[in-house]
């Protein structure tokens, strides 16, 4: 935990029930990022875990261009019933940041897919780093988990820290995100 500062815990009542929240401040050469963990009290030795990267447009604004907001809502609902945690990483736009994500969206509006758009503005298809999530798992002493994901990169990253069993998280496609979901499946290897 040498590069993380940990906040106190606080209660968070939600539409899904009462959770607790705790912040982890990641310190790095480019400043700091505050990541949030939303969790149920007394989760099991094999909790449900959702590793979720920030998506302002999907999570807060309800964008139909992606499946992020729906995936977060489904995860919170399941975790409230079965116990576990959401590790909410501040890695907007698969790690490119909000400003660049909006520029990528503008290219998508012109017909480019999500990967092509990222590459056109100078980024890889996915710039995220999940090592901080591993440190957070270690903080909570999680050695085994049921990971709510369709992303094989998340599975591989967390297997370095704990035994992972994948549980799928399927959000319904719509006319705005169907192409995006196809790209995630065909070009990024997502298990959809």
Curated annotation (Swiss-Prot):
GTP binds at residues 50-54, 92-94, 114, 149, 154. The active site is at residues 126, 128. Its EC number is 3.5.4.25. Gene3D superfamilies: GTP cyclohydrolase II. It catalyses: GTP + 4 H2O = 2,5-diamino-6-hydroxy-4-(5-phosphoribosylamino)-pyrimidine + formate + 2 phosphate + 3 H(+). InterPro entries: GTP_cyclohydro_II, RibA, RibA-like_sf. SUPFAM superfamilies: RibA-like. It is an enzyme of class 3 (hydrolase). Keywords: GTP-binding, Hydrolase, Metal-binding, Nucleotide-binding, Riboflavin biosynthesis, Zinc. Signal peptide: none annotated. One of its GO terms (biological process) is riboflavin biosynthetic process. Pathway: Cofactor biosynthesis; riboflavin biosynthesis; 5-amino-6-(D-ribitylamino)uracil from GTP: step 1/4. It comes from the Bacteria. Its cofactor is Zn(2+). Zn(2+) binds at residues 55, 66, 68. Binds 1 zinc ion per subunit. GO terms for molecular function: GTP binding; GTP cyclohydrolase II activity; zinc ion binding. GO terms for cellular component: cytosol. Catalyzes the conversion of GTP to 2,5-diamino-6-ribosylamino-4(3H)-pyrimidinone 5'-phosphate (DARP), formate and pyrophosphate. NCBIfam families: PRK00393.1, ribA. Belongs to the GTP cyclohydrolase II family. This is GTP cyclohydrolase-2. It comes from Helicobacter pylori (strain ATCC 700392 / 26695).
